[in-house]
Amino acid sequence: MTLDQLRIASRRSQLAMVQTNWVRDELQREHPDLVITIEAMATQGDKILDVALAKIGDKGLFTKELEAQMLLGHAEIAVHSLKDLPTNLPDGLILGCITKREDPSDALVVNEKNQIHKLETLPEGSVVGTSSLRRLAQLRYHYPHLVFKDVRGNVITRLEKLDSGEYDCLILAAAGLQRLGFANRIHQLIPTDISLHAVGQGALGIECVSGQQKVLDILKTLEHESTSKRCLAERSFLRELEGGCQVPIGVRTEINNNELILEGMVASLDGKRLIRDIKKGSVSSAEEIGIDLANELKGRGAGEILEEIFKSARA
């Protein structure tokens, strides 16, 4: 028996819709007789724009409403930016597919007056816009002379704030800029020795109801094996550290032949402490590599850094 209809839950932001439309089009190409519909909605993270993401403090800021649609039987799948999807999913839901990763780098975007600068040459006191604690902590560590200011809203809104002079530059995900047609605004891809990217950054995660084999069979055409293995290691690293989307944890992964290399980082919010290391192993042991690296960093003080952050958030 085949599946006749597939309902996709999605955030309604411009980037989310670009990503979801891509998933729909790819699935439609492989399954031309399948009726595919999209239900777009706003999530808590989309609605609360006057508070820094870290202060809202909910791991499912951009996913809970989509997950509710699936659990209520109103959608078969949900499309997420994988970096927004918590590592522990609600009972009854699974991560059914991870798509091929786009460039996971962080990107520097500047306004007209700062075109002559790279990140490393920005003048003292330059205002850097970011909503990510991970980017904030790493950049404070390397460039303590810069001023960091929270920025919220969709990509277009953020670019408008930059161009109006509210910020000297922004740090955004390169993949999001490319998907929205703003690749020309990427002034510099930030090197990984300065900023490790977020877990899952650049990849899409498709969540679905567990036990729905027909849905999983349909999603197989979008699964990208090497991206999936890399993200499995990254997500197990994050899970073992008990971190969410709004913690200063960064990663980098690569696969050479059958060897998976995972680099991980935990930093304090003031930028004064940064713990970083690399773990290598067989691709077949991706999850174990992530767990082992997390425990190594814990042994070097990462646990204490994260506990301070969690305690501050609870206060």
UniProtKB/Swiss-Prot annotation:
Keyword presence, Transferase: yes
Single GO term (MF): hydroxymethylbilane synthase activity
Pathway(s) this gene product operates in, as recorded in its UniProt entry: Porphyrin-containing compound metabolism; protoporphyrin-IX biosynthesis; coproporphyrinogen-III from 5-aminolevulinate: step 2/4; Porphyrin-containing compound metabolism; chlorophyll biosynthesis
Alphabetized UniProt keyword annotations: Chlorophyll biosynthesis, Porphyrin biosynthesis, Transferase
Cofactor: record remark: Binds 1 dipyrromethane group covalently.
EC category name: transferase
Annotated GO biological process: chlorophyll biosynthetic process; protoporphyrinogen IX biosynthetic process
Cofactor requirements of the protein: dipyrromethane
EC number: 2.5.1.61
Pfam families linked to this entry: Porphobil_deam (PF01379), Porphobil_deamC (PF03900)
Record-listed S-(dipyrrolylmethanemethyl)cysteine modification sites: 245
Any one cellular-component term (Gene Ontology): cytoplasm
Enzymatic reactions: 4 porphobilinogen + H2O = hydroxymethylbilane + 4 NH4(+)
Job description of the protein: Tetrapolymerization of the monopyrrole PBG into the hydroxymethylbilane pre-uroporphyrinogen in several discrete steps.
Additional remarks: The porphobilinogen subunits are added to the dipyrromethane group.
Family: Belongs to the HMBS family.
Subunit structure, as described in the record: Monomer.
Protein name as annotated: Porphobilinogen deaminase
